[in-house]
Amino acid sequence: MRLKHLPSEFQEALPVLEKIKAAGFEAYFVGGSVRDVLLGHPIHDVDIASSSYPEETKKIFPRTVDIGIEHGTVLVLENGHDYEVTTFRTEDLYVDYRRPSQVSFVRSLEEDLKRRDFTINAFALDEKANIIDKFNGLVDLEQKILRAVGNAAERFNEDALRIMRGLRFAAQLNFDIEKKTFIAMREHAPLLEKISVERSFIEFDKLLRAPYWRKGINCLIASQAYDYLPLLQSTADKWQQLLTDLPEDFTFSTSEQAWAAVLLYLNVENPRSFLKSWKTSNDFQKTVEKLLAIYRLREDRQIKKTDVYQYSATLLTLVEELRQAQGLAVDFEHIKELDEALTIHDKHEIVVKGGDLMAAFDLKPGPDLGKILNQIESFIVAGNLANERQAILDFVRKEID
């Protein structure tokens, strides 16, 4: 098969392929970018595979960076872009179900493509826009099937993260997982306990944010992979409830919204501890906790202006979206009106600072000054005090007197 048109991202990288070939080696575009162009999706990173060994690649290009030379990868800086050029390679036994014990460089493209995870990721594209398809990936792409390259059991035994990648691809592409591939995923799911939590989170997060996340969750349940992920043991019924409650066409707007929904349906008592187990950042944990706090607040009452100031219209809107998906009462317009009525959205916007008050009224740092600053903030947020220097100073003068 040949592409009618080579996308600009590949055209910009053509000089790299041409220089490698001019030096007597083979070079191809490989990986997700080739799959994405075949699907008509936006192209992200353009990766190149070559028969040139790392030291040979470095001799071809004046500007390179060693970023993974032990695995055959050299970063080539060309025409204002940087491209990862990786030597064709085979991999020995995997020591920890994630990394090969040894990488061997080879001159054969087919040997290199054999080690890929799924047939739809095992394409190569040459400089003339010809697609090299050694494993019938084009057929699988057309039939929307996710199939492991070669022996599925071997692929997942080599790298158990491929199980999560498979679930994620099903969710992103709306592909069905081929029967033998799925059986191997289910049989090898216990190996997910060997995988770093951070890597599992990245894949799971992409699954939740995907347009067909429901398919991903259904596959997660059917494969029983959840039993081998942090704090998700025996949660099939709760995942099923999430699928039942949220409509078919609902998609999550942000990762934080998605994980807040997950924690809500899993009835997690300590969200911070749960998210720490998934090795998420402090900022991520705080945002999810805020979303859950807003959700609980909304169970009791409507949103007030102070809520918009405390949590932000953005987070309040995310919770309203989730409530709307659940068929609960929502008021997006009310949040918008309250947000527009706020004269400040952060205390740093207050024109008078603590130092100004200390100078104007001979105040000392301490609890009393903090109390006055909090009063100023509360009055401005409530709309009872203008955020103007003179108005604030007059207010403080009255409070002190």
Swiss-Prot record:
| Recorded GO MF terms | ATP binding; CCA tRNA nucleotidyltransferase activity; magnesium ion binding; tRNA binding
Residues recorded as binding Mg(2+), renumbered to this chain, are D45, D47
Pfam families per the UniProt record, alphabetical: PolyA_pol, PolyA_pol_RNAbd, tRNA_NucTran2_2
User: For binding ATP, which residues are annotated in this chain's numbering?
Assistant: G32, R35, R116, D159, R162, R165, R168
| Keywords assigned by UniProt, alphabetized | ATP-binding, Magnesium, Metal-binding, Nucleotide-binding, Nucleotidyltransferase, RNA repair, RNA-binding, Transferase, tRNA processing
**Gene Ontology biological process:** RNA repair; tRNA 3'-terminal CCA addition
Cofactor dependency: Mg(2+)
Q: What is its EC number?
A: 2.7.7.72
Q: Which annotated residues bind CTP?
A: G32, R35, R116, D159, R162, R165, R168
Q: Which reaction does it catalyse?
A: a tRNA precursor + 2 CTP + ATP = a tRNA with a 3' CCA end + 3 diphosphate; a tRNA with a 3' CCA end + 2 CTP + ATP = a tRNA with a 3' CCACCA end + 3 diphosphate
The organism's place on the tree of life at top rank:
Bacteria
EC category: transferase
Spell out the note in the miscellaneous section: A single active site specifically recognizes both ATP and CTP and is responsible for their addition.
The UniProt subunit note reads as follows: Homodimer.
Q: Which family does it belong to?
A: Belongs to the tRNA nucleotidyltransferase/poly(A) polymerase family. Bacterial CCA-adding enzyme type 3 subfamily.
Q: What does this protein do?
A: Catalyzes the addition and repair of the essential 3'-terminal CCA sequence in tRNAs without using a nucleic acid template. Adds these three nucleotides in the order of C, C, and A to the tRNA nucleotide-73, using CTP and ATP as substrates and producing inorganic pyrophosphate. tRNA 3'-terminal CCA addition is required both for tRNA processing and repair. Also involved in tRNA surveillance by mediating tandem CCA addition to generate a CCACCA at the 3' terminus of unstable tRNAs. While stable tRNAs receive only 3'-terminal CCA, unstable tRNAs are marked with CCACCA and rapidly degraded.
Name under which the protein is recorded: CCA-adding enzyme
Q: Which organism is it from?
A: Streptococcus mutans serotype c (strain ATCC 700610 / UA159)
**Gene from which the chain derives:** cca
